[in-house]
């Protein structure tokens, strides 16, 4: 994917405020501090398209970006940060389920996991929603430069078992080395333009 132009469109919290039009959308989801901002910035060749917050999880907004005038990149709010107020945590579930169930031009969701962490309940819930609403997931495991090859293999097995997928469905990524960037774009293009014949992580 050659990135020619990326522009912020708007932020929203409810369907009435989502951008108009029928451009296909690819959304990015993951717990706070999972490396979502770094992944997006590397994929679109920008240093600060998505800024890393000093107070993770406090901003509960869905952010929409136009990419090449061809599709929309959607940055979903992070989840799972312990110090977020309870009221904010309660908003996350309904906001996510509404977007996933009602956004007809949503083609797929990049579910981002940290190679050093066991997936949390919200990760499992997100994957459940994607399956329930027939949204194709692409599982990306970040921060792979922070562990050894042996530790990566062990952690990958734990992650796959926890969320109920095959290890081969994991896409490994490092913001430092850019490992996985091309593979992830191939997966995204497949979902956007129909090359993918079946949902990643679909239950057999």
UniProtKB/Swiss-Prot annotation:
Pfam families: MMR_HSR1. One of its GO terms (biological process) is division septum assembly. Its cofactor is Mg(2+). Coiled coil: none annotated. CDD domains: YihA_EngB. One of its GO terms (cellular component) is cytosol. GO terms for molecular function: GTP binding; metal ion binding. Residues 22-194 form the EngB-type G domain. InterPro entries: G_ENGB_dom, GTP-bd, GTP-bd_ribosome_bio_YsxC, P-loop_NTPase, Small_GTP-bd. SUPFAM superfamilies: P-loop containing nucleoside triphosphate hydrolases (SSF52540). GTP binds at residues 30-37, 57-61, 75-78, 142-145, 173-175. Mg(2+) binds at residues 37, 59. Keywords: Cell cycle, Cell division, GTP-binding, Magnesium, Metal-binding, Nucleotide-binding, Septation. Belongs to the TRAFAC class TrmE-Era-EngA-EngB-Septin-like GTPase superfamily. EngB GTPase family. PANTHER family: ENGB-TYPE G DOMAIN-CONTAINING PROTEIN (PTHR11649:SF13), MSS1/TRME-RELATED GTP-BINDING PROTEIN (PTHR11649). Necessary for normal cell division and for the maintenance of normal septation. This is Probable GTP-binding protein EngB. It comes from Geotalea uraniireducens (strain Rf4) (Geobacter uraniireducens).
């Amino acid at each position: 994917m050659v990135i020619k132009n990326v522009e912020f469109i708007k932020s929203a919290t409810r369907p009435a405020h989502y951008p108009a039009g029928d451009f296909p959308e690819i959304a990015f989801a993951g717990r706070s501090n999972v490396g979502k901002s770094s992944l997006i910035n590397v994929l679109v060749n920008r240093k600060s398209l998505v800024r890393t917050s000093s107070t993770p999880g406090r901003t509960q907004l869905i952010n929409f970006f136009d990419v090449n005038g061809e599709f929309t990149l959607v940055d979903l709010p992070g989840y799972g940060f312990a110090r977020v107020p309870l009221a904010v945590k309660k908003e996350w579930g309904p906001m996510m389920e509404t977007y996933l169930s009602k956004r007809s031009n949503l083609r797929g969701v990049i579910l981002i996991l940290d190679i050093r962490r066991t997936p949390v309940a919200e990760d499992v819930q997100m994957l459940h929603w994607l399956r329930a609403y027939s949204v194709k997931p692409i599982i990306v495991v970040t921060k792979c430069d922070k562990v050894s090859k042996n530790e990566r293999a062990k952690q990958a097995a734990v992650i796959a078992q926890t969320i109920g997928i095959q290890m081969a469905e994991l896409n490994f990524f490092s913001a430092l080395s850019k490992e996985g960037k091309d593979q992830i774009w191939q997966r995204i293009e497949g979902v956007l333009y129909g090359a993918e014949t079946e949902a990643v992580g679909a239950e057999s």
